[in-house]
């Protein structure tokens, strides 16, 4: 059974908030600096942000490389720091999720293990996939963790999707939001129209 987003966190997300992408802290020899990484997490909490997104572009996708093996550590460190702060307000923990289905499922399960509330599901790097295959991947991940969809512009590895794709996407249970970074008004409107036409129009945030 998939995890469901806490109502207080959903209310924060729907009301509108700032969820910055968490950078990766390295020392002068380009090694992971855990102390400064934890300091960055504390900074975002102190700044009044509504949450942080960890394991996304600013955290560098290379942390997933087998030769680097930092994805687990980076997710764990941020989550530990947030939990130890014992904030008296909602704070959304978002984990970046990417790759083919098997990788995306493994990352979703890891995010859940460390107490993340949402998975920001990238659809980049799937140029050879059909829209039907990508939608099934979304369903598989959403069966594990609540999902924020991510429409990424083609110039940085994304792809263009049809209105029909987003119409089906919006009907998938446990999709909580869609981040639209297509940087194209027509593609953006496709997402807006699809969500507004779906049965879940009152449940999905943009």
Placement of each model-derived feature along the sequence:
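Active-site beta->alpha loop and helix N-cap motifs at the rims of alpha/beta catalytic domains
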Residues: 2-160
């Amino acid at each position: 059974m998939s995890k469901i987003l806490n109502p207080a966190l959903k209310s924060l997300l729907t009301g509108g908030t700032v969820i910055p992408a968490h950078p990766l802290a390295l020392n002068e020899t380009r090694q992971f600096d855990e102390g400064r990484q934890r300091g960055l997490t504390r900074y975002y909490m102190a700044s009044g942000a509504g949450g942080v997104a960890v394991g996304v572009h600013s955290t560098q996708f290379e942390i997933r490389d087998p030769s680097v093996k930092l994805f687990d550590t980076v997710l764990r460190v941020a989550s530990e720091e947030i939990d130890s702060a014992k904030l008296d307000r909602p704070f959304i923990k978002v984990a970046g999720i990417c790759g083919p289905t098997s990788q995306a499922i493994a990352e979703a399960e890891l995010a859940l293990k460390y107490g993340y509330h949402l998975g920001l599901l990238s659809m980049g790097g799937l140029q050879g996939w059909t829209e039907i295959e990508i939608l099934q991947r979304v369903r598989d991940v959403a069966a594990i963790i609540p999902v924020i969809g991510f429409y990424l512009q083609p110039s940085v590895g994304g792809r263009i999707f049809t209105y029909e794709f987003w119409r089906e996407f919006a009907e998938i249970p446990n999709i909580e939001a869609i981040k639209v970074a297509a940087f194209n008004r027509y593609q953006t409107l496709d997402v807006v129209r699809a969500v507004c036409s779906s049965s879940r129009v009152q449940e999905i945030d943009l």
